[in-house]
């Protein structure tokens, strides 16, 4: 089954709605972003999700912050995983206590071979195997831009390595994306928002369409 992550949650109600869909990961942002939340709010979300069984893993999103800050917030907010969306080195990743989701930024000039080389370098350098997340490179934002990149890159990389993908995905295009790219996982933020706020109806529709497309795949 394709893994799913709803990212940029800012309220407990959004997190509970995400959990009800059966999503695998719920993301809260601590990096500079319009979706950034306080540690207090993140802890509220963690405590609301904790009694649920099953429940989505709570992922904290960071970008170019110190490893000490990342580990402190992860502990205080009872995170399950840490997503590193900046330009963090592999050495830096090894300093993070929790399992890591490492973003690989895909620019217009990026090829599938370059992505594969970066994944191979990470696997060689890291003490623990991370989840690799391919996301669109933008100058201003570390994710959540709503901009997509060449899906053929995902298709080629997925033949060799399991990857999660973000960037421009929404309920309207997700089934076409899955058919072409066949990713291990999918991450969405702006694609399930209305006027910049998480839309629970869109979250449900998105996950429903992922499950439907995944069930119709011929592996």
Curated annotation (Swiss-Prot):
CDD domains linked: PRAI
Gene3D superfamilies given in the database record: Aldolase class I
Keyword tags: Amino-acid biosynthesis, Aromatic amino acid biosynthesis, Isomerase, Tryptophan biosynthesis
EC supergroup of this enzyme: isomerase
One GO process term, biological-process aspect: L-tryptophan biosynthetic process
Record-listed E.C. numbers: 5.3.1.24
Protein name from the UniProt record: N-(5'-phosphoribosyl)anthranilate isomerase
Lineage: Bacteria, Bacillati, Chloroflexota, Dehalococcoidia, Dehalococcoidales
């Amino acid at each position: 089954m394709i893994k799913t992550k709803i990212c940029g949650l800012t309220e407990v109600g959004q997190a509970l709605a995400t959990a009800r869909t059966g999503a695998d990961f719920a993301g809260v942002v601590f990096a500079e972003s319009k979706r950034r939340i306080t540690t207090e709010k993140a802890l509220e979300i963690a405590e609301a999700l904790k009694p649920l069984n099953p429940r989505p893993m709570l992922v904290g999103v960071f970008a170019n912050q110190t490893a000490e800050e990342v580990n402190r917030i992860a502990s205080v907010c009872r995170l399950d995983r840490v997503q590193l969306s900046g330009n963090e080195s592999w050495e830096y990743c090894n300093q993070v206590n929790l399992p890591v989701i490492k973003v690989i930024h895909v620019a217009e000039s990026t090829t599938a071979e370059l992505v594969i080389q970066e994944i191979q370098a990470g696997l060689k350098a890291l003490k623990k195997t991370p989840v690799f997340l391919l996301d669109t490179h933008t100058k201003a934002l570390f994710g959540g831009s709503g901009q997509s990149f060449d899906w053929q890159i995902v298709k080629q990389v997925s033949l060799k390595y399991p990857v999660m993908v973000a960037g421009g995905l929404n309920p309207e295009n997700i089934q076409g994306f899955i058919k072409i790219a066949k990713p291990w996982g999918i991450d969405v933020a702006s694609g399930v928002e209305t006027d910049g706020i998480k839309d629970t109806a869109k979250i449900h529709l998105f996950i429903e369409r992922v499950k439907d497309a995944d069930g119709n795949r011929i592996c």
